[in-house]
Amino acid sequence: MAVGSAAALICDTGALLDYLVESAPDHRLFRSAIDQARTRYVPGLVLAELDYFLRAERRAMERFMRDLARGAFTYAPPTLDQLSRAIAIDRRYSDLGLGLVDGSLVALAESLGLRRVATRDVRHLAAVRLRDGSPLELVVHPTDPDKS
């Protein structure tokens, strides 16, 4: 699993939660990894999930939305083709319970020709293969990776 570098990066929900919430156990590590990326993509479904999880951290979400609006992150809403692909990916990995959000993240990676994903979700995303058979390059620093 990689440490951050200047290459483009797709951000998953858990990574952004740790990036935004200063009291998170891995805040500094995810902040460093994400800040090093040249381009930081936020998938549309990740943004919705992030908003839900940050209900109690509204200031953090507001700061993030300002950063997103000024272009510090690249918002990447799913296309209909990407949603169809996300559903197919979720179906293919049904034994993992991957879900639409993670499926859309993989579909975005395929569409952009990227492999680097900042995530805490090692269990799900380490098992996934892109359409060409290659694995994602997970940029992780979790003290306690998601068990979901």
Annotate each predicted stretch with a short phrase.
Residues M1-G4, V106, G113-S148:
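Acidic, PIN/NYN-like endoribonuclease modules and their adjacent C-terminal/linker elements
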Residues G14-A15, L45, D81, R123:
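Alpha-helix/helix-capping structural signal
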Residues R55-A56, E62-L80:
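Helix-adjacent hinge/juxtasegments
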Residues M1-V42, L54-M65, P145-K147:
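Short, well-structured N-terminal submotif of metal-dependent ribonuclease cores
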Residues E57-M61, S94, G133-E137:
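Short, hinge-like loop/turn segments at secondary-structure boundaries
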Residues V3-G4, Y75-R120:
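Active-site neighborhoods of divalent-metal-dependent phosphate/nucleic-acid chemistry enzymes
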